[in-house]
């Protein structure tokens, strides 16, 4: 795959707590230069990214209920709404893993549905945190997302014990078919890993190592 083609798969990501305004400006500059699909940033930096990315094709993606997914549903929905007002064009929300583990699937569905309604047509990705789920739970969560017609299912926050695996991406793709996108994220730091995820069915890659990925290099910084 040509580097420019691979770049269009990448949400260029900076989500750790210590990121400064200068870090976000650098992220945006890199995204413009390398023609990444989007920058994925915390909500407080949306206005800054909007200013930096005006008149470019780079989209602004933000995270909701991040990284635990355990916020009140009303808060998640409000955060999504406010983020979109501020300029977010894609929303990555964290599913409520505790409710999945409790078997409270109706609550899981309602939580996603509320954020989806708040998005009002803005692309919604649902982060499953696959490293905490059984294969059956991954399938069930994907089925709910498919039935609700969200935009994407996403593997991971990158803030837990493990990130994306080829097996989980393949299972997610198998469950949602061609109806939804699949985003692989967490621990993807080189071209080989990114291509393995794409070959397994990923249509988006979330990574802080986007430049290393498209240049065929290894990023050993240990980031998202």
Curated annotation (Swiss-Prot):
Entry similarity comment: Belongs to the DeoC/FbaB aldolase family. DeoC type 1 subfamily.
One Pfam family it belongs to: DeoC
This protein's pathway: Carbohydrate degradation; 2-deoxy-D-ribose 1-phosphate degradation; D-glyceraldehyde 3-phosphate and acetaldehyde from 2-deoxy-alpha-D-ribose 1-phosphate: step 2/2
Subcellular location: Cytoplasm
EC number assigned by the record: 4.1.2.4
Cellular component aspect of the GO annotation: cytoplasm
Substrates-to-products reaction catalysed: 2-deoxy-D-ribose 5-phosphate = D-glyceraldehyde 3-phosphate + acetaldehyde
Keyword Cytoplasm included in the entry's annotation: yes
GO biological process, one term: carbohydrate catabolic process
Main function: Catalyzes a reversible aldol reaction between acetaldehyde and D-glyceraldehyde 3-phosphate to generate 2-deoxy-D-ribose 5-phosphate.
InterPro entries per UniProt: Aldolase_TIM (IPR013785), DeoC (IPR011343), DeoC/FbaB/LacD_aldolase (IPR002915), DeoC_typeI (IPR028581)
Xref: Gene3D superfamilies: Aldolase class I (3.20.20.70)
NCBIfam families found in the cross-reference section: deoC
SUPFAM superfamilies registered for this protein in UniProt: Aldolase
Main location group: cytoplasm
GO molecular function, one term: deoxyribose-phosphate aldolase activity
Keywords from the UniProt entry: Cytoplasm, Lyase, Schiff base
Gene: deoC
Key word Cytoplasm present: yes
Active site: 92, 154, 183
Disulfide-linked positions: none
Protein's name in the database: Deoxyribose-phosphate aldolase
Organism: Mannheimia succiniciproducens (strain KCTC 0769BP / MBEL55E)
SMART domains with a match to the protein in the record: DeoC (SM01133)
């Amino acid at each position: 795959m040509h580097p420019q083609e691979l770049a269009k798969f990448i949400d260029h990501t900076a989500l750790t707590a210590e990121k400064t305004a200068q870090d976000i400006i650098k992220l945006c500059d890199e995204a413009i230069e390398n023609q990444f699909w989007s920058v994925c940033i915390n909500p407080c930096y949306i206005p800054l990214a909007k200013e930096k990315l005006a008149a470019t094709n780079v989209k602004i993606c933000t995270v909701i209920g991040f990284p635990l997914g355990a916020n009140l549903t009303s808060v998640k929905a409000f955060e999504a709404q406010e983020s979109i007002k501020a300029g977010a064009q894609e929303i990555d929300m964290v599913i409520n893993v505790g409710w999945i583990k409790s078997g409270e699937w109706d609550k899981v569905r309602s939580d996603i549905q509320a954020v989806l309604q708040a998005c009002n047509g803005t692309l919604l990705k649902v982060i499953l945190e696959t490293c905490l789920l059984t294969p059956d739970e991954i399938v069930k969560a994907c089925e709910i997302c498919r039935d609700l017609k969200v935009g994407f299912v996403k593997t991971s926050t990158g803030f837990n014990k493990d990130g994306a695996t080829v097996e989980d991406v393949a299972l997610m793709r198998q469950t949602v078919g061609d109806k939804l996108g699949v985003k692989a994220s967490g621990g993807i730091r080189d071209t080989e890993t990114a291509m393995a995820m794409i070959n397994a069915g990923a249509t988006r890659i979330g990574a802080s190592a986007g430049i290393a990925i498209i240049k065929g290099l290894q990023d050993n910084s240990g980031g998202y």
